[in-house]
Amino acid sequence: MLQVPVRIPPEKQLKRSLVFLLVPNFSMIAFATAIEPLRIANRLLGHEAYRWRLASPTGKSIFASNGVEISVGGSVEEERRALLNDRKPSMVFVCSGVFVEDFCDKASFAYLRETHQRGISVGGLCTGAWILARAGLLAERRCAIHWENLPGFSEAFPRADVHADLFEIDHNIFTCAGGTAALDMMLALIGEDHGDDLVNRVCEQALTDRVRASHDRQRLPLRARLGVQHSKVLAIIEIMEANLGEPLSLVEISRRISLSRRQVERLFDKEMGRSPARYY
């Protein structure tokens, strides 16, 4: 008897299949907050809209920066072969964390390049933008990276259009700054696929009260973080933090806030207990 193929309604079809490439010392919080909204979305939808698998450079289990060991399903070489068959994913995210500057696995860089060349979306979680840039994928592309890594990243990859935002989506390249910013980026992805109603329901399950915009600040407001109230000092620090990659001279900073260099030095010493040069 001829078997009639079972037709799956469009609303119940798989939306995205993802590979998470974990590298040594990857950020557990970025990894978990990227996967969990997808899991919650699947549960609320009642079907598998998102499917994922884990990989590491060698295919062996890998340690996060918090010491937790994670088992993976395959190696980079296996995932490179999967690009040629029906296991080809629709997105690949590389998840890294501290000491990303030391990561130099050529096979991983080649895999990310091949993935991108085949029109598959690629992304970086936490410091993953560093690895994407090392693979040659971020020239003239907007990207986000953790604020702590931004100065070094700007110096190492001057052609990357890096921003101190929570996340950036530039065509088919997705990057986020790490921490809980991965949650916001994935919620944006879910919203694109299924609309705001599902996003709101995922937020309710995750006990988060809002979806942050991509351009929201990474760090606490200066007043709260530093306990400083003087508007001129806050303006000076905002200028400094906006120009970490290419620091401005104190003369230029003074000019921007309409004070003399001497006034800025006295004010900074009074309010911060140190010179502008020591802070910057």
Task: Enumerate the predicted regions with their spans.
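Conserved anion/nucleotide-ligand pocket segment
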Residues: A164-L207
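Structural detector of well-ordered beta-strand residues that form the stable sheet scaffold
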Residues: V122-G123, A144, H163, F174
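A conserved active-site-flanking secondary-structure segment within enzyme catalytic domains
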Residues: L138-L166, R201-A206
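Extended, subdomain-level signal for the structured scaffold at the beginning of enzyme domains
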Residues: M1-V122, I131-R134, G191, N200, ...
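Acidic/polar active-site rim loop that often engages polyanionic ligands
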Residues: W130-L138, A182-M185
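Residues that mark the start of a beta-strand
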Residues: K15-S17, R142, N172
